Swiss-Prot record:
Mg(2+) binds at D747, D749, D751. Belongs to the RNA polymerase beta' chain family. Zn(2+) 1 binds at C63, C65, C78, C81. It comes from Thermosipho melanesiensis (strain DSM 12029 / CIP 104789 / BI429). Its EC number is 2.7.7.6. This is DNA-directed RNA polymerase subunit beta'. DNA-dependent RNA polymerase catalyzes the transcription of DNA into RNA using the four ribonucleoside triphosphates as substrates.
Length: 1649
């Protein structure tokens, strides 16, 4: 006995930010190496990404080294290899981690939009990224050079930048001068003149050396001077022409000083006297001056006193020119005491004049190529450079070079620098005040080093993730919250600042609520997912294919290890920073590749898939694996038609069935012999595998009553998956019943279908009783049959029940065959006496009727009361018959009828021998005449145009109209002509509805008519030929546009429709029937839906069908509850309206008077049933009651008490009724009341004033609607009304949201994609239709494709329509109070109302589309909902698609379900938050209830211990503590808390329980209703799981994690994701706990017995 009780295992799923400790707690070990698998052994590397020690063994129950093998060692850790012996399944579960050497920012929190880290820290996102990625800042700053360091540590000549200088200058005393930086100096230095070089050196004011190279070009006058002369001048002196350089000089003779020998040296011009050998004298040498000659011969002996030389006079040397004196190189002089110079060796003295001189300053470090005194020629190089590139100079220094080297270099006084930036993480309070900096400010590293120089350790800054981590650790969230809240009070609610603060406040509150520490957003350790989720697979050729994740992990590990190494090696800061940045980037790529910077790609340039990519999108974890799973016990095959099957059967190929039911067959074979041994199992398996007969016998048994599910993709609605009872067939194709093709949208041109086997008894029961195809005949979209005969069946039935053309002319008495019974007629037919279509007389139910045998045959299968012996059954008639049968007899009889129709239809379609040939397309003789007439009219129009009576636009419109009329006439003539022969096969097909339509027939045998060009504009040349005659070349060419457009359209449509369906399902999936009755008194007024252009979109009866009444319906005549005379049904509240009721109520109206007088007898008064007003006035208690006052019980009581006996009143019976006619005033053309208007007292008085006596009205009908349902979750049965698929009230648990989405989305592919042009030039608005229009409405687009229309905001009349000179139109509307409202009509749209027309609020005054959001803002929710309903419905109705209103209403309800918080009062929500309407109502109710207990709470809280400290803002705006944690609450503390506006105190009870007491009344939430587009509504759902699985997965998850969001699994998707039964249908708790017991053995034994 198996009892299956089902309880929800998971009640909620929470998502949070993981702390580093949590990440490490998940892990089974640290991954230290980037290696994966050893290339030789193919075993995982130790400590690598696939390490067995961390992740578990690769072989089941076997350690890595093989020491322990087998399950008996389970749990043992091998001491050799360290691997724990367990199942290899562990490799899917066990995680590792990587300890990061440097912290890294989690890219989700940085790059969410808007960035969470940025909002929380109050740092701009760009700046924040810059800090994290060690970025820089481009700064243009001035250069300054220290000229006087004074007492500072600066060196003279050192460089400072403006930013540093400003910081130093505040505290230090030193002098600077603006500087410049030298750019592109010309090198080398080349002399521009020939001349002599002079070199000198000097120091600048910054103590730097300049070498001066002077080159001079000189003119010289040479004056020879001789030894012995005395110079009057010295080198460099200036002399004038005629000055004496040397004065005239008398030279005396030389006499011998002693006896000796004379030696004369002519070369050196000397004379020497050597003494005698006996003498003690030393030799004496005389230098002979110029002009002195010896008078004694050489080597002669002389006596003391002998004359040796002659005496002479040396002439004076006179300067021949003025100039500077320069001594020649060979001149040797000796200074004398009187300042003159004696010439020692003869030489030249020059008088020089400088012709040209150049100075070349060279900065220190330049290499000089010349020496002092060198003679150089022009163009010779002096030095390698005069300045270095990027040399910095003070302005004074710059001027020197600027003067000597003009235009040979450029200088910049400002320099652009890329400065690394840092963020301040710590700052002393005093320093903060002094510098104006605070924690979180971003400065450049230059500024930082300046501050560090000045303040030492009182300021700290850092960059990269570690800096952000420090900032986050510094945050005191409680304090921050208080600060933001106090600031919010000071700024305007709508300002941008307020929005920023609110976003920040939300994050702070979320972090507090989820108890998340902000620094957890910075990763210290990274989890490594289990290896089997990122496998490596060996491909042929011995290579390995690996998952992208492994590559990404490898990059992280490599960079992390390299960073460690670099750090240990004490590498330079810049290298370490770069490595840290690379590590950050590697982790970013791992988490979300491509979000920051360029994506990491593989060899082929494909971006690698990161962890985020594994979650998001169609191929992500959510949509691919959690919401879409693969199914076991399934198969697929091609389908073929199975005409012999019953509607609930399908043919299953034997092979396929055997494979699907193999386990069942095996179990049955084993059960038969009660064997369980292994050999028995093997044997029985062999029986199955060898396909022995007994296997098939068992299969036949098992399959009986075991339904299978068939599904055809695309699964657009629930009818695409139905249950059938399988029949075993030969062959390989599944046989499908032809009548279930429409719901599956299947045909037999190669379609495939999938089969699924429901396994458990509960699943089989559901399949059998809910999903069997015979219970799915009626479509849940519109409540009409969908499993319908078509094509050949319709043709067969039509052929069976049709008659010849003379049938009606034959009189009864002239009919040859008369039968006493149907059997007799059958006999005659069998023997060939009569044919199917011969008129015969037959006695049926005691009356003789004229019919045909065919009609008798068909009537035989029809339920008795619907038999009609004189009707030809086409498609429509069959549909009506099926629907009537369903309503009267239910679904089983209907299914049987359908099967009978199918059998008859196929049989007689075969017998009919229907064929088609080209000659069957008769061409009407009228055709030619109609075309000729049209041509004649066209030439008249052309003539008028030529004469200028018509504009081109008018001519075009007329032409189109003429041809359109002609085409229509040809169509009618053709059909009529073909129909003259009822047996014409083409006519049979078209008239029966089997195939083809009048339009196609027109093209084949009439004329093709007008075509559209690619833009959608109609081409004015029609195609006059038809396909039977053949088209001309031009005609064929014109017609290609449409064909091509059609093909392109279809392809586009499919994907758009699919996406629309997906969004609709997403927005509505959680709408389930949760309760039978929400008890609401509200509802919507039933009305005829008319679109803005006045076309009826939906009749009243269709609006009412399937609804439940919210209020009693009163008969306008009698004011009693309305009763249906046909069935006696009373229309009271909670009555469900079926088809017949809807027809009755939709067409019921009566004429009643507008007003009448009435007397109320005050002695025994009764309140009138209708609205009444006083005619006579009276005074009571000093108050005057005038005529026109509404009469109620209060007035009657006062009138009685005032002494009156009778009260005359005017009764208005029409008030509160709905007009079904338009009443126009006789005086002017003003409409007094319009069709479908609810008549109010003012309207009634206006009618009375215009002497209207009576009006045709219907009762006001208020029906329940999902739009007004007040169920907390989902909707209730009564507001939803009828379940359209079975015409009973909907059951609790039905997933009506999904059904609604499918009903709307499924016909999406039938809608057109086109934007039609209203003919002519594009000035008139294009009308958006079909799918784009539906999407525009569901997505509540702000930008519309067509111009925006104008609507009225009041009820009134069009007083006037005025056009000014510029062509702008204005519409003036007079409301019922007589006020005038003016509306400007934009030039792009036309006025769509007329003067005197009555206008209701929300009604269009012009063409163009109206924005639903505008209606919501200016009018109300009901009008908006009705507008959306009308417009969306119109899109589908135009395309001939019938969908019940309630499906649209569910989507509209979801779009309008959210409210926007304007003022959150004292809740934790923020302005701008979107919440569910019912939730807000509940919260507000709760707040108001709790406010009552404030006084009691204040008493209770005294004496309790504070669990959290109390902080508030004091008078100065400072955040202060009122009471610390852990103290006892006293009266004084309570008083302070109340004064500070603290509304709640959290305390500990005596038993340590933590309780929150409210001590001040709280404000409820103020909100406004919002209209959300479906995509937004999907994302704005309560649960994060379903939002994350829809779109923007990373964003949703990021926000949810910060919030610590809890998903209570209320919707369907959430439960599918966690793998539970969905809370709908039998998965609801109320059904889920029903016990289902399966007793297979018992049943078996009974069978045997």
């Amino acid at each position: 006995m198996m009892g299956s009780t089902f309880k929800r295992k998971i009640s909620k799923v929470t998502v949070k930010v993981a702390s580093p400790e949590v990440i490490r707690s998940w892990s089974s070990g640290e991954v230290k190496k980037p290696e994966t698998i050893n290339y030789r052994t193919f075993k995982p590397e130790k400590d690598g990404l696939f390490c067995e020690k961390i992740f578990g063994p690769t072989k089941d129950y076997e350690c890595a080294c093989g020491k322990y093998k087998g399950k008996k060692y389970e749990g043992t850790v091998c001491e050799r290899c360290g691997v724990r012996v367990e199942s290899k399944e562990a490799r899917r579960k066990r995680m590792g981690h990587i300890d990061l050497f440097a912290p890294v920012v989690h890219v989700w929190y940085l790059k969410s939009s808007p960035s969470i880290l940025s909002s929380l820290l109050g740092i701009q996102a760009k700046e924040l990224e810059n800090v994290i990625y060690y970025g820089g800042k481009r700064i243009i700053e001035k250069i300054l050079i220290v000229t006087n360091p004074k007492d500072t540590d600066f060196i003279k000549g050192s460089l400072l930048y403006q930013t540093e200088y400003e910081i130093y200058n505040q505290k230090l005393d030193f002098e600077v001068m603006p500087g410049v930086i030298i750019k592109s100096p010309v090198a080398p230095v080349i002399s521009s003149i020939s001349g002599e070089v002079k070199i000198r050196h000097e120091k600048t004011h910054t103590d730097r050396e300049i070498t001066w190279v002077d080159v001079r070009k000189i003119s010289r006058a040479e004056h020879r001077v001789y030894n012995g002369m005395v110079l009057n001048v010295k080198n460099g002196d200036y002399v004038n022409q005629g000055d004496e350089i040397v004065s005239e000089m008398q030279i005396d003779p030389i006499y011998a000083p002693f006896d000796g020998t004379v030696e004369i040296d002519e070369i050196s011009n000397t004379i020497t006297i050597k003494p005698l050998t006996t003498s003690k004298d030393m030799p004496v040498t005389f230098s002979l001056p110029y002009g002195v000659k010896p008078v004694v011969p050489n080597n002669s002996k002389v006596k003391k006193g002998d004359q040796l030389t002659n005496g002479t006079v040396l002439p004076a040397v006179i300067a021949s020119v003025s100039g500077n004196i320069s001594f020649g190189k060979e001149l040797n002089v000796r200074p004398l005491e009187d300042g003159k110079y004696e010439v020692l060796t003869s030489g030249s003295v020059y008088v020089e004049n400088v012709v040209e001189e150049k100075h070349y300053p060279l900065f220190e470090g330049a290499f000089v190529y010349v020496k002092d005194g060198d003679e150089i020629s022009e163009g010779q190089t002096i030095a390698d450079r005069f300045l270095f590139e990027d040399e910095y100079l003070t302005l004074d220094e710059y001027k020197i070079f600027e003067q000597h080297y003009p235009a040979m270099f450029t200088a910049e006084s400002e320099v652009e620098n890329d400065r690394p930036i840092v963020v301040i993480t710590e700052i002393d309070d005093e320093v903060s005040v002094e510098t104006g900096l605070k924690i979180g400010d971003i400065i450049t590293d230059h500024q930082y080093s300046a501050y560090r120089t000045l303040y030492n350790d009182k300021i700290e800054a850092d960059s990269g993730a570690s800096a952000i981590k420090k900032l986050l650790q510094k945050l005191d969230l409680e304090k921050l919250k208080a600060e933001i809240e106090s600031e919010l009070k000071k700024v305007s609610k709508s300002s941008g600042r307020a929005k920023k603060l609110l976003r920040r406040l939300k994050i702070v509150k979320d972090l507090l609520k989820s108890e998340t520490k902000p620094e957890w957003m910075i990763l210290e350790a990274i989890p490594v997912v289990p290896p089997d989720i990122r496998p490596m697979i060996q491909v042929e050729g011995g290579r390995f294919a690996t998952t992208d994740l492994n590559d990404l992990y490898r990059r992280v590990i490599n960079r992390n290890n390299r960073l460690k190494k670099l750090y240990e090696m004490n590498s330079p800061e810049i290298i370490i920073k770069n490595e840290k940045r690379m590590l950050q980037e590697a982790v970013d790529s791992l988490i979300y590749n491509g979000r920051m910077g360029k994506a990491v790609t593989d060899r082929n340039g494909r971006a690698l898939k990161s962890l985020t990519d594994l979650l998001k999108g169609k191929k992500g974890r959510f949509r691919r694996n959690l919401l879409g799973k693969r199914v076991d016990y399934s198969g697929r095959a091609v389908i073929v038609v199975g005409p012999h099957l019953k509607i609930h059967e399908c043919g299953l190929p034997k092979k396929m069935a055997m494979e699907l039911f193999k386990p069942f067959v095996l179990a049955e074979l084993l059960n038969k012999d009660d064997e369980t041994s292994k050999t028995a199992r093997k044997m029985k398996k062999a029986i199955i595998e060898k396909e022995m007969p007994q296997a098939y016998e068992v299969l036949e048994e098992i399959i009986k009553g075991h339904p299978v599910l068939l599904n055809r993709a695309p699964t657009l609605h629930r009818m695409s998956l139905q249950a059938f009872e399988p029949k075993l067939i030969e062959g390989n194709a599944i046989q499908l019943h032809p009548l279930v093709c429409p719901p599956f949208n299947a045909d037999f041109d190669g379609d495939q279908m999938a089969v699924h086997v429901p396994l458990s008894a509960a699943a089989q029961a559901e399949a059998k009783f809910l999903m069997l195809s015979r219970y799915n005949i009626i479509s849940p979209a519109h409540g009409k049959p969908i499993s319908m005969p078509g094509k050949d069946i319709v043709a067969g039935v039509y052929y069976l029940t049709m008659v010849g053309k003379d049938y009606d002319k034959v009189q009864k008495e002239n009919i040859k065959w008369k039968f006493s019974s149907i059997d007799e007629a059958e006999l005659a037919y069998e023997f060939g006496h009569i044919r199917l279509h011969d008129p015969i007389l037959v006695k049926v139910d005691d009356r003789v009727i004229k019919t045909t045998y065919g009609r008798l045959v068909f009537a035989n299968i029809v339920p008795r009361e619907f038999r009609d012996y004189n009707k030809t059954y086409g498609k429509g008639a069959i549909k009506d018959l099926v629907y009537k049968t369903f309503k009267k007899y239910g679904v089983d009889r209907t299914a049987d009828l359908l099967d009978d129709i199918k059998d008859l239809g196929f049989h007689y379609a075969t017998i009919s021998g229907l064929t088609v040939s080209i000659t069957d397309f008769y061409i009407s003789p009228e055709r030619r005449r109609i075309i000729d007439e049209a041509k004649k009219k066209i030439s008249e129009v052309e003539e008028l145009f030529a004469l200028g009576f018509l504009s081109d636009e008018e001519r075009y419109r007329e032409t189109i109209k003429i041809w359109a009329d002609a085409t229509e006439k040809v169509q009618d003539a053709t059909f009529e002509y073909i129909g003259k022969d009822p047996f014409n096969p083409v006519y049979i097909m078209v008239d029966s509805g089997a195939r083809g339509n009048k339009d196609q027939l027109k093209q084949l045998a009439g004329m093709r008519g007008l075509m559209a060009d690619p833009s959608g504009r109609t081409i004015e040349i029609p195609i006059i030929s038809n396909f039977r005659e053949g088209l001309s070349v031009l005609e064929f060419f014109i017609s290609t546009h449409g064909a091509r457009k059609g093909s392109a359209d279809t392809a586009l449509r499919t994907s758009s429709a699919g996406y629309l369906t997906r969004r609709l399902v997403d927005v509505a999936q959680s709408v389930v029937i949760t309760t039978t009755d929400c008890g609401t008194e509200n509802g919507v007024r039933a009305t005829v839906l008319k679109s803005s252009d006045g076309l009826t979109v939906e009749k009243l009866e269709d609006f009412l069908f399937g609804r439940v009444l919210a209020k009693d319906v009163y008969d306008p005549k009698t004011n009693s509850v309305l009763v249906n005379p046909e069935n006696g049904k009373e229309y009271t509240r909670d009555t469900m309206i079926d088809d017949d009721d809807a027809k009755f109520l939709g067409n019921y109206s009566v004429r009643i008077p507008v007003s009448r007088e009435l007397e109320i007898n005050l002695t025994n008064p009764e309140l009138p049933e209708n609205y009444c007003e006083l005619i006579t006035d009276f005074i009571y208690d000093g108050v005057h009651y005038d005529e026109g006052t509404e009469v109620n019980w209060d007035i009657i009581r006062k009138a009685k008490n005032s002494g009156l006996e009778k009260l005359t009143v005017k009764e208005y019976p029409i008030v509160g009724k709905v007009s079904v006619e338009t009443v126009v005033s006789q005086k002017d053309i003003k409409q007094l009341v319009v069709d479908e208007e609810l008549i109010m007292p003012t309207t009634a008085k206006i009618l009375e004033g215009h002497n209207v006596e009576s009006v045709q009205v219907r009762p006001e009908i208020i029906v329940r609607s999902v739009l007004t349902c007040e169920a907390e979750h989902g909707v209730c049965s009564k507001c939803y009304g009828m379940d359209l698929s079975n015409h009973k009230i909907i059951g609790v648990g039905e997933a009506v949201g999904v059904v609604a989405a499918q009903s709307i989305g499924e016909p999406g592919t039938q809608l057109t994609m086109r934007t039609f042009h209203t003919g002519g030039i594009a000035t008139t608005a294009d009308i958006t239709q079909g799918l784009p229009r539906a999407e525009e409405l569901f997505e509540a687009r702000k930008k519309l494709k067509e111009p925006e229309g104008i609507f009225s905001r009041v009820k009134g009349y069009v007083k006037d329509i005025v056009e000014d000179e510029t062509g702008k139109k204005k519409v003036y509307i007079e409301d019922e109070a007589g006020d005038i409202h003016e509306y400007d009509i934009p030039t792009k749209v036309k006025v769509s109302v007329n003067k005197g027309q009555k206008i209701l609020p929300g009604q269009s005054l012009s063409t163009g589309a109206i924005r639903p959001r505008k209606i919501l803002e200016t009018l109300d929710v009901d009008t908006t909902a009705l507008y959306l309903l009308k417009e969306i419905k119109k899109v589908y109705v135009e395309q001939g698609v019938d969908i019940h209103d309630k499906h649209f209403e569910i989507i509209i309800k979801q779009m309008l379900d959210k409210v926007e918080v304007i003022d959150p009062g004292d809740t934790d929500y923020l302005p701008g938050d979107l919440l569910r309407l019912q939730m807000v109502k509940r919260i507000n109710k709760q707040i108001l209830e709790e406010n009552v207990h404030v006084e009691t709470n204040r008493k209770r809280v005294i004496g309790k211990i504070l669990h959290q400290h109390l902080i508030a803002e004091d008078e100065n705006g400072e955040i202060v503590e009122i009471a610390p944690e852990g103290v006892e609450v006293t009266e004084e503390i309570l008083e302070k808390a109340i004064k500070s506006g603290i509304k709640e105190i959290i305390v500990k009870n005596g038993d340590g329980e933590i309780v929150t007491y409210q001590i001040l009344p709280k404000e409820p939430i103020k909100y406004r209703r919002r209209l959300l587009r479906i995509t937004k509504a999907s994302l704005e759902r309560v649960g994060w799981l379903s939002a994350a699985s829809f779109q923007q997965t990373p964003q949703v998850l990021t926000e949810a994690a910060i919030e610590g969001s809890v998903d209570h699994l209320l919707g369907l998707k959430e439960n599918v994701i966690v793998g539970q039964l969905i809370p709908a249908g039998t998965g609801l708790d109320m059904f889920a706990n029903i016990q289902i017991e399966e007793t297979p053995r018992l049943a078996q034994k009974e069978k045997m017995a």
